[in-house]
Amino acid sequence: KILFITFHKKDDENQPNFYRFTDYLGDLTLHGFRELYGEDVIDFPGSWHLYKDEAEKRKINKDIIWGRGFTYTNILDNFDNINREDIKNKIKSNYFELIVYGSIRRSDLFLDIAVNSKSKIIFIDGHDDTYIEKKFLKHGLYFKREYFETTKNVEPINLSVPKSKILKSIDIKPIHLVAPLIPGKSKTYIYKNEEDYYKMYQKSIFGITYKKTGWDCMRHYEILMNGCLPLFLDIENCPDLTMKNLPK
């Protein structure tokens, strides 16, 4: 069994069941674990916005969720099939072979218990900065997204996309030389649904992308998965250990 500790931050008091701040890396890594290990992966407290049934039940408002939820919401099924009961005691009794902290700098729930168990521990840090929380390194393997300097017990990690989202065949008659969406130009952020957003890249030869706060970004992968070529500005300045698995 694998325990995946997720991060949630409550929005305003009028929407107590909605979590505005998600974590792309944590959410998509959870999806990858579930693809590999199925319901042996227990997400706690539970990333409900990833589940089609639960997101519909809670009437998720995509207008106030990061990136309108494109690519990373509604990618799992059967939220209630996962047994999330008595997690604390299960950690104490070494029920889990592995405990993954999906966003360690936002949530270290049960860590005081986990470090005294026999479970292996993985920490994931998807923040945009290059800071590493070194106090965790003695307890497990630390995966850092914006990674620039070799550090003991730290490994690089990339963002990802669900395989089901990858375009099966490329449009051989694209309309645009360069995709209309220009990162940082708010007036080009006109896409209200995932389908139209994807079609914009599918109908384009190149998609402009570049470093904003951090080097790694969902946009790079959304361009690629829709059969479009990333026109990545200043890619030569990207640290070797950041986006290590992305051809650059």
Model-derived features with residue positions:
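Nucleotide-sugar donor-binding catalytic core of glycosyltransferases
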Residues: 1-247
